Amino acid sequence: MNLPAKLGARGLGVVIFAIALASGARAQVLNSGARTITLQAVLSDSITVSLSSNAVNFNLTAGNASNPGSTSVTATTSWALKPSVGSLKLYAFFSSSTAALTDGAGNNIPSADFQISNNAGPFNALTNTVPFGGANAGLQLSSTPILGNNRTGSRNDVMNLNINLAPLPSLPAATYTGTLTIQAQAI
């Protein structure tokens, strides 16, 4: 027996209607025009420096070369830099080489007698001209080459501070104050 005879006229009509309905459903798909969204994500270049302490005290001994600070200071430098940057440098500086610390009455401790040991290295006086601060009143603490794998990163520099009073044997007793600044530069 063939299919039309098995289904009968009514069954055959139902099958034909179902096929027509299914093919008609596909023919009724309607899509809108495509619309786009423009995306822009900006990661700005940045450098930040944070310090573990913003105050260090010294108990000075007249004429003594070793007058260490009360605490070390850790400078944490963090960055996100553009591909054109080749290095990141960290500097310490005073605004004046002749009066890094002063008693306000004309007696001064020059930057040449203020010393920093960075990351357990030797003590160095602040006698260089750096991009910031006064002439002959700075010190480059570190230089980090910026390569493809460290365009974003951070580093710590642990600074021990000392005031050398050996060159100042007649410095009068007083309270001496000053401001040491730490700043980074990407080049």
Name each region found by the language model:
Residues 2-13:
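Bacterial N-terminal signal peptides that target proteins for export
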Residues 13-20:
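Bacterial N-terminal signal peptides
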Residues 22-24:
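N-terminal signal peptide c-region/cleavage motif recognized by signal peptidases
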Residues 27-122, 128, 138-187:
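N-terminal small/polar-rich segments of proteins
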